[in-house]
Amino acid sequence: MIPYNHKNNLAGFMEKRDLYNENSEVTSKTYFKGDPIPAGYYPMVVMICIQNSNGEFLMQKRVLSKGGDWGVTGGHPKSGETPYEGMVTEVHEELGIDISNKQLEIFSQGCDGVDCYKMYYLKADYDISDFKIQEEELTEVKWFSIETLNHMIETGELNPNQVACIMKCYNYLNKKSK
């Protein structure tokens, strides 16, 4: 198998993305997935915490080739997409649902020296059967209580890069309810 890069994009998986500055502002610079990022520029990462009316959070389990761990839905906006549009695209690609008419709340955003990021929150009720998962990326989706998520954090069952997202969302919701 030939490793993917934009120069040998035989399968049509070329993914061009915009680069951002340290203030999370889009620049005129772009890069292709897998290419090195020039100094002083950052890719945008978007993530979403979806919570149902029972207080449970939707988690997705990645295929083994992508770590095989649980995490929230997320990814990188394609070139020309805003972070919001990228989040809508990622949710549609990975979960098979359209959230373009839903009210998303940003609960955290910034740049951490590696990535720029926007973290979104959505309160919505979906039945697991509503999801049409992207089988190349996911094996299952499931609703989890905050207690179960805390246990999964302690046992390392969650994607370590996304524990911060879950904790920030939980803190956001606690502040919002007061």
Stretches found by the model and what they are:
Residues 6-11, 65-70, 79, 112-178:
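Nudix hydrolase/Nudix homology domain
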Residues 36-41, 108-119:
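Acidic pyrophosphate-coordinating catalytic loop
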Residues 45-70, 74:
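A glycine-rich, hydrophobic loop/mini-helix early in the fold
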Residues 59, 71-106:
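The catalytic Nudix box helix
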